[in-house]
Regions:
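Active-site-proximal region of nucleotide-activated glycan assembly enzymes
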Residues: 18-82
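Short alpha-helix at the nucleotide-sugar/activated-sugar donor binding site of glycosyltransferases
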Residues: 19, 42, 174, 192-193, ...
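Donor-nucleotide binding loops and adjacent catalytic segments primarily
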Residues: 81-83, 89-179, 213-217, 221, ...
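Conserved donor-nucleotide binding/catalytic region of nucleotide-linked donor-dependent transferases
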Residues: 226, 231-254
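Acidic donor-binding loop of glycosyltransferase active sites
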Residues: 2, 167, 171-189, 197-198
């Protein structure tokens, strides 16, 4: 009765054939910049379901599109902020949550080591005022502590530094966070929006059609995020962006 695709290459010929057979067809596009398959299918399927309205301009003008967003887990939407902060021992500190995906991202880990060295430095303005949860990913779990040591970060036995391989309790971490630093995948951004969290986005350049950049710019253009392209990412640029936000709490709330 209905064939649903989600924009991957394999869904193209299946949805096209279903349309030829007169079966109702729907394709969902999770990114702000539609992929090749979605663009082609927009001529044939009954409806294109979009995550954001900004994607409309790339589709066939005659197609029928509906903006529905991306699916988000209920636990993200309904997580209790106070309980999450108590569980994670954040207290009244500014909570930063950062991650680069399950495999990790070397450039992000390098910049995050600089950031931790900056806010844990003895005598610095933010020493003891920031609780930082960082997921290194699979390939950073062994290297990251050494990066911190080389940069002079005060992290060992520091209750305000929580280093993990992976974040398994993302609902609690997002609920507790004041600022999130991460990539700009469609699902991640949908969770940030659902949780209402300010973010610094560092889109992966290694994705089809640079779609993470386009995803991130949707939030930037709605004053919901700051974006740093990976080619411009340094410890200095990240620390500057974080300092501007945490020094003006109203920016984190707006």
């Amino acid at each position: 009765d209905l064939v649903v695709g989600t924009g991957g290459y394999v869904s193209g010929p299946i949805l096209r054939k279903a349309a030829q057979l007169g079966i109702k067809t729907v394709s969902h596009e999770s990114n702000a910049f539609p992929g090749v398959t979605t663009k082609l299918l927009s001529r044939y399927v009954d409806e294109i379901l979009l995550a954001v309205p900004e994607a409309k301009k790339y589709l066939d003008p005659k197609c029928k599109e509906v903006v529905v967003g991306n699916p988000v887990r209920e636990s993200i939407v309904y997580a209790d902020r106070q309980k999450a902060r108590e569980k994670l021992a954040v207290g009244d500190k500014i909570c930063i949550v950062s991650f680069g995906g399950s495999q990790g991202a070397h450039r992000l880990n390098q910049a995050m080591a600089d950031l931790m060295a900056w806010h844990t430095k003895k005598g610095s303005e933010f020493e003891g005022k920031i609780h930082h949860i960082h997921a290194t990913g699979k390939y950073g779990v062994e290297d990251f502590p050494q990066m911190l040591r080389e940069k002079g970060a005060n992290f060992e036995q520091n209750p305000n530094v929580d280093i993990r391989e992976y974040i398994n309790d993302m609902d609690d971490c997002l609920a507790a966070a004041d600022l999130v630093i991460c990539r700009a995948g469609a699902s991640t951004l949908s969770e940030l929006e659902a949780a209402g969290r300010a973010s610094i986005l560092i889109p992966s350049p290694n994705v089809a059609e640079n779609h993470q950049y386009h995803n991130g710019m949707v939030l930037v253009n709605n004053n919901a995020a700051v974006l740093i392209e990976e080619k411009n990412l340094t410890g200095e640029s990240l620390c500057k962006a974080v300092e501007e936000l945490v020094s003006q709490p109203q920016k984190l709330l707006s």
